[in-house]
Regions:
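Positively charged n-region of N-terminal signal peptides that target proteins for export
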Residues: 1-4
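C-terminal motif of bacterial Sec signal peptides marking the signal peptidase cleavage site
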Residues: 14-17
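Bacterial lipoprotein signal-peptidase II cleavage site
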Residues: 19-25
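Long, folded non-catalytic interaction modules
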Residues: 27-160, 165
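Secretory pathway targeting signatures of secreted, lumenal, and periplasmic proteins
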Residues: 37-39, 53-67, 204-280
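Signature of long, low-cysteine stretches enriched in small and polar/charged residues
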Residues: 90-145, 151-152, 273-337
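Short, well-ordered beta-strand elements
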Residues: 140-149, 245-252, 338-348
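Surface-exposed amphipathic alpha-helical segments
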Residues: 152-178, 339-376
Length: 376
């Protein structure tokens, strides 16, 4: 399985390192997943900088960060601690804590995710960004931003802060992917491999359905269903504990140039899943929330240089129980067989925080491998 390709598209010089030294035994990282320690000396923003920041999407209800930004740390926290999109509860990308440069000692160095902002005109003549894996501990992600001035850092962070955040997110996803390699559902993997695909679905997921959905009636665990033709679908579920996690992978012929647009993917999701996933009330089915928090999409990079369309949204049960939760899907083109492949995860956990569980399930989607990935 090829390693997830991580891109940090920034204009500054980027150096990637692994470990502070060679042959060292690293301690285990401290802190929880999706926590980030920010090491920096704070300073107030100028009024011009405050006015510039106020014009951006960093501070509004959509970003989830609405408190005033008056200093450098506020600016960093506005990005790293912004709300994740399309979540039923308010949950940030990262839980952010801060220490000053003087406070950053050996007690803090093993922290799992560290962002160091070093502003020093005596040491630096230009801004540089360096990223490291397993520098003081393992697993650890470390990003250093070195700059001669506060003004240069503010301009840089406004333009590239979200890319830095994405790098940290990708580090967490990569760690989770490595964990899945040690324990996969052999039945689910064999089903996908028979279609020319591969995916690391964990062994604690159970195969619910594997079928070709066509004009004829097919069987689900609950109801006979009839769906549009030429859709091959695998549905797996982990219903252990207080949270339910589901994975669906479905493919269909590539026939429409609009396939990778949000309206098309929304319609295809509704057409397939509404006929497959039902609830206990007769006539109920899986739907998508379009009014309160519509789905959002973006292009992402998976495998090495392959592209996928990511969709995030909220699912809900229609004509039945008051059930719903977040979902994430990746859609790619199988270039060898001319088929579209969508892998989606969705969660149900009433009243519980879901960010970490969703990210863990999302990491499964990144392991999807299509025929062209093995040819490279």
């Amino acid at each position: 399985m090829k390693k997830l390709h991580l891109m940090l598209c920034i204009l500054a010089v980027v150096l990637v390192g692994c470990g502070k030294g060679t042959g060292r035994t690293l301690t285990s990282a401290t802190g929880s997943v999706y926590e980030c320690l920010v090491v920096m000396n704070d300073a107030p923003l100028t009024q011009d900088q405050i006015n510039e920041v106020a014009k951006l999407s960093l501070v509004n209800e959509a970003s989830g960060y609405t408190k005033p930004i008056a200093n450098l740390y506020d600016l960093v926290e506005a990005v790293m601690g912004a709300d994740m999109p399309c979540m039923p509860q308010v949950e940030p990308y990262f839980r952010v804590t801060k220490v000053s440069t003087a406070q950053f000692d050996d007690m803090f160095k093993p922290t799992r995710n560290i962002l160091i902002v070093d502003i020093n005109p005596q040491k630096y003549t230009q801004l540089k960004t360096k990223v490291f894996n397993d520098y003081w501990s393992t697993p650890q992600a470390l990003c250093r931003i070195q700059t001669p001035s506060e003004e240069e850092f503010v301009s840089y962070w406004i333009e590239h802060g979200e890319e830095i955040r994405e790098w940290f997110v990708n580090q967490e996803i990569t760690r989770q992917m490595k964990f899945y390699r040690a324990s996969t559902n052999k039945q689910a993997r064999a089903i996908l491999q028979s279609q020319g695909y591969d995916m690391l679905i964990p062994e604690d997921y159970m195969v619910i359905m594997d079928t070709v959905l066509g004009g004829a009636t097919t069987y689900s665990l609950r109801n006979p269903i009839t769906v549009a033709p030429e859709v091959r679908l695998l549905w797996c579920c982990n219903n252990k504990g207080s949270m339910r996690r589901d994975i669906v992978v479905y493919s269909y012929p590539y026939t429409d140039n609009n396939t990778f647009t949000l309206p098309y993917l929304n319609a295809k999701r509704d057409a397939v899943l509404s006929r497959v996933i039902t609830a206990s009330v007769e006539g109920s089915y899986m739907g998508t929330e379009y009014t309160v928090m519509p789905p959002v999409t973006r292009a992402i990079t998976v495998q090495e240089d392959e592209h996928a369309t990511e969709v995030r949204g909220l699912w809900k049960i229609l004509n039945g129980e008051a059930m719903g939760g977040p979902y994430v899907s990746h859609t790619r083109l199988d270039q060898v067989n001319g088929r579209i492949v969508t892998a989606e995860t969705f969660l149900y956990a009433a009243g519980q925080k879901k960010r970490t569980a969703l990210r863990q399930a999302e990491a499964i989607l990144y392991t999807l491998q299509l025929p062209q990935d093995t040819i490279k």
